[in-house]
Amino acid sequence: MSTYTQILYQVVFSTKYRRKTLSKPGREQLFRYIWGILDSRRCKLFRINCVEDHMHIVFALHQSVALAQLVQDIKVGSSLYIKRNKLFPEFTAWQTGYGAFTYSAEARNNLIRYVMNQEAHHARKNFKKEYVRLLREQQVEFDEARLFEEE
């Protein structure tokens, strides 16, 4: 019997100390680099977007890929890529950790729209509030005092 899976993830992570370093010039190049990592692991990218202080990636995880290793490869690889290509001069690193949330196939289109509209969304709500809302929505237990590294 063949193996078939449908594991739709939204992965979210921020810049170190949530510094607003991901300016618009350079984002498309960064997105293409991350897409290349996903593609090389046979994961299907549905949408990637960011604002100045954090990144959202919506993708289908291939059954042969471990999520933690994939996210580590994305964060380490993209950090080196950003620095080597001087995409964002003020960028120092990604924050430790990430959020990974699963969704049904039926939720995919709404999730893609949500990630596409990050600029408008963050005109009203900061990343901390968005992240806490995601954790609560997904019923993830967390300690709010330990969510983010502070300077």
Name every feature range the model reports, one short phrase each.
Residues 1-151:
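Basic nucleic-acid-binding interfaces
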